[in-house]
A protein has these predicted regions:
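Short, charged/polar, low-complexity loop and linker segments
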Residues: 98-110, 135
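Short secondary-structure junctions and interdomain/linker hinges
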Residues: 31, 35, 58, 94-98, ...
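Residue-level recognition of alpha-helical structural elements
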Residues: 37-40, 76, 115, 138-142
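A ubiquitous short alpha-helical element
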Residues: 9-13, 110-115
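Acidic, proline/glycine-rich low-complexity IDRs
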Residues: 4, 110-113, 121-177
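Heme-based O2/NO sensor domains and their adjacent alpha-helical segments
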Residues: 60-103
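Charged, amphipathic alpha-helical oligomerization/scaffolding segments
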Residues: 16-23, 27, 43-57, 82, ...
C-alpha cells in the first residue's frame, strides 16, 4: 500500500478519477444511443479497460476513510433502465456470458450474466460517487468509488472486460463466426 495521501493529493486524485468516470459514463451512453453501431464492442472493451485502470489505482491506495461516519445523501439514484434496455438490444447476439463467480473459492460457481446488466450496475455505482464529487465531497466520492470497486463494479467490470475481449478475439481469430 502507498503512503497516506494529503488532502491536496486526495483532491487531485479525486478529480482524476471523476474525469475517468465521466468519460466512461459518456461513452456508454453514446454506445447505448447507437452512436457507434459498427464498433460498439471494441469501444466498450476500450472504455471498460480504461475504467479498470482507474479502479486499479483505487485498489492500490490506502483505504479512503470518509469524514463522516454515515454517507451523505447523494440524491436519487439514476434511472438506468432505459440504458440497460438499449444496451441489451444492441448486444443481443452476444449479451449473455458465463463467469466463474469466485475463482479463489474451493468450489467455484459458474454464473450466467448479461453484459448490459453489468454495465448498468457499473454506471449506477460510478454515478453515485460522481454525485458526491460534484457536491464537493471528494473524500466521500473516493471512499464510495474505492469501496464499490472492491465489492461491486470492479468485479463486474473485470467480468465484462473478459466477455468483450472474448467477443473481439473470436471475431478476429475465427471470421466464420
Amino acid at each position: 500500500m502507498s503512503e497516506p495521501m494529503t488532502s491536496d493529493d486526495l483532491e487531485d486524485f479525486g478529480t482524476e478519477i471523476a474525469d475517468q468516470v465521466t468519460s466512461f459514463l459518456m461513452a456508454v451512453r453514446a454506445v447505448a444511443r447507437g452512436d457507434a453501431p459498427d464498433s460498439y464492442v471494441p469501444i466498450l472493451l476500450l472504455e471498460i479497460s480504461q475504467l479498470l485502470l482507474g479502479g486499479g489505482r483505487l485498489g492500490a491506495i490506502r483505504d479512503v476513510v470518509p469524514d463522516e461516519r454515515f454517507e451523505s445523501d447523494a440524491g436519487p439514484d439514476p434511472d438506468l433502465d432505459e440504458l440497460r434496455e438499449k444496451l441489451a438490444a444492441l448486444l443481443k447476439p452476444v449479451n449473455t456470458y458465463k463467469e466463474v463467480f469466485d475463482p479463489l473459492a474451493t468450489k467455484s460457481e459458474i454464473e450466467t450474466r448479461r453484459i448490459s446488466d453489468d454495465l448498468a450496475l457499473i454506471c449506477a455505482d460510478l454515478a453515485h460517487g460522481l454525485a458526491h464529487h460534484r457536491d464537493g465531497r471528494i473524500t466521500e466520492a473516493l471512499w464510495w468509488w474505492q469501496f464499490s470497486y472492491l465489492s461491486s463494479w470492479g468485479p463486474a467490470a473485470s467480468a465484462v472486460m473478459r466477455a468483450l475481449q472474448s467477443i473481439v478475439a473470436r471475431s478476429r481469430l475465427d471470421p466464420t463466426r
